[in-house]
């Protein structure tokens, strides 16, 4: 069989996916939180000269010394995405001088809402070497699935909190408040996700530019479109921009990477 990197997307259609059995080599999930009394985040630890368990694991995987990796983490050139609540994670580093990492997007939608199927996708992705799982669920009760991911999946887990905001509160977009959006970010952090996509860049000034300057295309980002629509409906500033410091405090508390 050819190496996956030598194949085109269509070549995978005939592949049969082998799901991991009970003898999987993935590390077992441990109960409880990782100890972080001396530092808040992996970056903070690196800046303090503290060698974390995650740093040691990543250095070994990347065939680097701790002394080579630590300054890269301290300077923000490498991120070790490892939420302190995701205790079964098999840590990976992302960034400068490291191996390329594979991310797999999945999640339920209105048209496909079977969480068991999504978990099968997760197992298949991990068994084939995926380093990260991005949960893009946009329908139904997402909490049990997200918590199952962080309880059982050793890969990094990412989410897009804005996708979850409307379905979490089950209210019209225009009725949500800035606090509602920020609270969902906290919920995802508490649930153990390792990284999040936040649409902080669009501002009231940006909206005026969009209205007065013709674009070749409409906004193509789903999350960006939701933020844009909410701002137009309410006349308010982007909550992720206006309350950015509060968002950073939340992410720092749980060690979540943006």
Where are the language model's segments positioned?
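Short, Lys/Arg-enriched N-terminal segments with co-localized hydrophobic residues
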Residues: 14-35
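Often metal-dependent polyanion-binding catalytic scaffolds in large enzymes
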Residues: 38
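Alpha/beta enzyme core
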Residues: 41, 45, 52-53, 57-257
């Amino acid at each position: 069989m050819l190496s996956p990197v030598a194949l085109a997307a269509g070549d995978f259609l005939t592949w049969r996916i082998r799901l991991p059995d009970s003898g999987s080599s993935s590390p077992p999930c441990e109960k409880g939180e990782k100890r972080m009394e001396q530092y808040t985040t992996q970056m903070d630890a690196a800046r303090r000269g503290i060698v974390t368990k995650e740093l040691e694991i990543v250095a070994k995987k990347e065939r680097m010394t701790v002394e080579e990796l630590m300054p890269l983490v301290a300077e923000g050139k490498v991120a070790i995405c490892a939420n302190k609540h995701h205790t079964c994670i098999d840590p990976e580093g992302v960034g400068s001088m490291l191996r390329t990492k594979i991310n797999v997007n999945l999640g339920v939608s209105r048209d496909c809402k079977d969480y068991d199927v999504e978990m099968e996708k997760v197992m298949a992705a991990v068994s084939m070497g995926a380093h990260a799982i991005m949960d893009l669920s946009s329908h139904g009760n997402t909490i049990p699935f997200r918590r199952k991911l962080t309880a059982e999946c050793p890969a990094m887990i990412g989410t897009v909190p804005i996708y979850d905001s409307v379905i979490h509160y089950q209210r019209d977009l225009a009725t949500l408040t800035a606090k509602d959006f920020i609270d969902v970010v906290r919920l995802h952090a508490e649930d153990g996700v390792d990284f999040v996509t936040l649409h902080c860049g669009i501002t009231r000034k940006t909206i005026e530019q969009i209205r007065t300057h013709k674009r070749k295309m409409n906004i193509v980002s789903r999350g960006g479109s939701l933020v844009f629509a909410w701002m137009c409906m309410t006349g308010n500033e982007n909550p992720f921009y206006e309350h950015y410091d509060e968002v950073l405090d939340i992410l720092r508390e749980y060690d979540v990477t943006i």
